[in-house]
Structures are given as C-alpha cells and as structure tokens.
C-alpha cells in the first residue's frame, strides 16, 4: 500500500503524548518510561493502532509498545489514539518511529516478552525477501531481544508469506506453539483484531496465525 506523504510529519509526531521521541534512551530501562516493571509486548508494524490499543485497554498489567517505520502511518495512528484516550488513562502504551533492523538500539537482551507481526508487507518478489519482517535476518534480532520463553505471534492473509515465515522460524529453531491455517473458521475466537483483519474477515478471506517461542 502506497502511503501518502504528509509534509512536516516528523515535527507533528512530537505533538502527541503517546509518541516516544527517542526510544533508545530507554534501552534496558523501560521501567523508567512506564514507571513499573511489567512485561513488555511489542508490535512491529503498527498500522492504525487498533490492535495494540485494544490490548492495552484490556491488559493493564502489560506494557505495550508499537513500532512503525513510516512517519505518516504513525502520525495517523497517534491522531486516532489521541481522540480516544489520554496517556493518563492508558499509561501502559507508547508508540515510536524506528526501523526494525535497529531494534538492538532500543531494547536489550531479554527486554521483550512478546512480539506481534500483524499483516506485514509480504514483499512478494524473491529479490525483496530479506525485507520481510519474518526473514531470518529479523528473526535473529527478535531472538536476542525476547525473554526466556518469549513469543512471536504472526497473523497474515497471505499464504505464501505464512509458509515462508514457518520455514524461517523452523530454520531459526523457534518452537511452534500454535499454527492455524484458517483462524476464523476453526472455531477459535480471537477478539483482538487489526482494522485490516476485520475487513478481511468480513470479505471471507482466510487468516493464518502462528505463535512460536524461542
């Protein structure tokens, strides 16, 4: 999906209280940002933010962080969140602009309990496969940041990406907890959905889901 350029997006991000301008300052000390020692869950590729916001509202004993590479996409998510709730009301959530390849600058070893990869760009061309967020290059980074028994959760509507992801996880010696080839038709209720997922389900699209541990 092509993202429309928004002039001044970088400066506009700073206007929102959920925006973390320099997340690297909290490496190994995210308790200073959240003011507690609760576990951290990270969504890589935030989109519009519905999934993470819903989780944060329900699970107040977990700290949720959302990473988005596109400043424009992040700005839209921040605007939407700002209309819904204040950080005082939802103090267990924060969003930041970063490249997932540089996550080691933001988190230390074992800092994250769970990583969510929801409807990531499939990068269908073979020459672009290293850009996929489930490529081995990214999985090696995630592994270093996940806590003992830490999890990766993947959801996608793209079968080719799902099968690629399973193979990459296997090659990196992750352990499969759950592999579902038709999430919403297997009688499994999943109340936490992204905006894309809601549209796909209404359109009758198949949703694939995987949970794997280190």
UniProtKB/Swiss-Prot annotation:
Catalytic reaction annotation: guanosine(46) in tRNA + S-adenosyl-L-methionine = N(7)-methylguanosine(46) in tRNA + S-adenosyl-L-homocysteine
Cellular component annotations (GO), alphabetically ordered: tRNA methyltransferase complex
Keyword Transferase included in the entry's annotation: yes
Active site residues according to the UniProt entry: 121
EC number: 2.1.1.33
Top-rank taxon, per record: Bacteria
Binding site for S-adenosyl-L-methionine: 43, 68, 99, 121
GO MF term list: tRNA (guanine(46)-N7)-methyltransferase activity
Family matches, as Pfam families: Methyltransf_4
InterPro entries: SAM-dependent_MTases_sf, tRNA_(Gua-N-7)_MeTrfase_Trmb, tRNA_methyltr_TrmB_bact
Keywords on record: Methyltransferase, S-adenosyl-L-methionine, Transferase, tRNA processing
Signal sequence residues: none
Residues bound to substrate: 125, 157, 194-197
Pathway of action: tRNA modification; N(7)-methylguanine-tRNA biosynthesis
Family to which this protein belongs: Belongs to the class I-like SAM-binding methyltransferase superfamily. TrmB family.
Function statement: Catalyzes the formation of N(7)-methylguanine at position 46 (m7G46) in tRNA.
Descriptive protein name: tRNA (guanine-N(7)-)-methyltransferase
Lineage per the UniProt record: Bacteria, Bacillati, Bacillota, Clostridia, Peptostreptococcales
């Amino acid at each position: 999906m092509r993202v429309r350029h928004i002039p001044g997006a970088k400066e506009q991000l700073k206007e929102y209280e959920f925006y973390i301008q320099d997340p690297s300052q909290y490496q190994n000390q995210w308790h200073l940002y959240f003011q507690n020692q609760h576990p951290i869950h990270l969504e890589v590729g935030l989109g519009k933010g519905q999934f993470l916001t819903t989780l944060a509202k329900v699970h107040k004993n977990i700290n949720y962080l959302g990473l988005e590479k596109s400043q424009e996409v992040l700005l839209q998510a921040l605007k939407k969140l700002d209309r819904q709730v204040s950080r005082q009301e939802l103090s267990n959530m924060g969003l930041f602009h970063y490249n997932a390849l540089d996550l080691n600058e933001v988190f230390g070893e074992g800092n994250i309990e769970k990583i969510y990869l929801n409807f990531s760009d499939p990068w269908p061309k073979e020459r672009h496969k290293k850009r996929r967020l489930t490529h081995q290059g990214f999985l090696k980074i995630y592994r270093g940041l996940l806590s003992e028994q830490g999890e990766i959760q993947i959801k996608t509507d793209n079968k080719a990406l799902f099968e690629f992801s399973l193979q990459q996880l296997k090659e990196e010696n992750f352990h499969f907890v759950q592999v579902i080839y038709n999430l919403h038709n297997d009688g499994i209720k999943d109340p936490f959905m992204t905006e894309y997922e809601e549209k796909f389900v209404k359109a009758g699209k198949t949703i694939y889901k995987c949970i794997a541990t280190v």
